[in-house]
Amino acid sequence: MAGFFSLGHGGGGNTPDNHRTNTNNPSSSGTESWLWCRNPNSNADGGEAGPSYKGTLELWQHPNNQEIIFQQQQQQQQRLDLYTSAAGLGVGPSNRSLIETSGGALMMMRSGSGSGGPSCQDCGNQSKKDCSHMRCRTCCKSRGLDCPTHVKSTWVPAAKRRERQQQLSTGQQPQQLGGSVPKRQRERIPARSTSMAYTRIPSNNTSGLEVGNFPPEVSSSAVFRCVRVSSVDDEEEEYAYKTAVSIGGHVFKGVLYDQGPAERSSSGGGSQPLNLITAGPSASSSSPNVSCNNGVVGSTSDHYIDPASLNYPTPINTFMTGTHFFSNSRS
């Protein structure tokens, strides 16, 4: 049986007063008190040792109130450090009072650690600045905590964020929703009449013709090919004739459209004002020397120009300046 003997006072006598058990005997002078402990059972397995050698003497220091308070504070600080390190894994003390009391200390520690804002105690993400539970919106909602700061979501789509960043980088203010955006006006091209406009060069005025070696009037034979054409506005097809002649070393191609009966068109000059082909009696439709075979109108004269022999590239379409646009010829 262990016995405690106080060593706080002087005197080494063997009186019964000095051998009484003392468990709470602080020194009167305020200094540390020591206890002398005798444990007779410590050498019970010591073999054949004599009874006078059984037992040991130990010195125990009696703690005062300040040391007890310091130990309690140190243990609480260790628990707070453990709770802080395990907060990201969702591990923490089960005592709710400890969580509530340590919230203020954790808030001070986190606010002083950096300016990036507090982190969520459950997932480790950034929490709201004004959240009293120090959690993000998802964790507050999943735990069912009554947090007034997480009522409205602050999530913004990535497209709007990029648009706002571009506006801020360029210095442009975001346009209001009700503002009108100016639209580009469509260019309106006036519709051309079905009748072709042309200007006949007078024969007496030869200014500019000598430079290009173009005579004012040409009489030659040509091959007219019958084709079917249709306008953009009107889907009705009509017959026309296209040809190509060589004048002054240049190739001239054109399309002759139907102008009506010969009696009405003869007064207007027929197809001669087009200046594409100014042929003689052999090229006139009323001449008896002209024959039409399988849609091909040709002259009976042996002197004619074959368009294939000119080695001129085939045009993409039959569009000419000053005329209507027609689709590609169909046979």
Swiss-Prot record:
Low complexity biased stretches: 166-180, 278-290
InterPro entries: SHI, SHI_C, Znf_LRP1
Subcellular location: Nucleus
Tissue distribution: Expressed in young organs such as shoot apices and root tips. Present in roots, stems, flowers, leaves, hydathodes and siliques.
Binding-site positions, Zn(2+) 1: C120, C123, C131, C136
Motif Required for homo- and heterodimerization positions after renumbering to this chain: 247-250
Polar residues compositional bias, start-end: 21-32
Region Disordered, residue ranges: 1-50, 158-194, 261-290
GO molecular function, one term: DNA-binding transcription factor activity
Disruption phenotype: High gibberellin (GA) levels associated with dwarfism, short hypocotyl, narrow leaves, reduced apical dominance, and late flowering, but more flowers.
Domain of life: Eukaryota
Residues that hold Zn(2+) 2 according to the record: C120, C136, C140, C147
GO process annotations (BP): anther development; auxin biosynthetic process; auxin-activated signaling pathway; gibberellic acid mediated signaling pathway; negative regulation of gibberellic acid mediated signaling pathway; pollen development; response to gibberellin
Record keywords, A-Z: Activator, Auxin biosynthesis, Auxin signaling pathway, Developmental protein, DNA-binding, Gibberellin signaling pathway, Metal-binding, Nucleus, Transcription, Transcription regulation, Zinc
Matching NCBIfam families: LRP1_Cterm (TIGR01624), put_zinc_LRP1 (TIGR01623)
Family listed: Belongs to the SHI protein family.
Designated name of the protein: Protein SHORT INTERNODES
Record lineage: Eukaryota, Viridiplantae, Streptophyta, Embryophyta, Tracheophyta
Gene: SHI
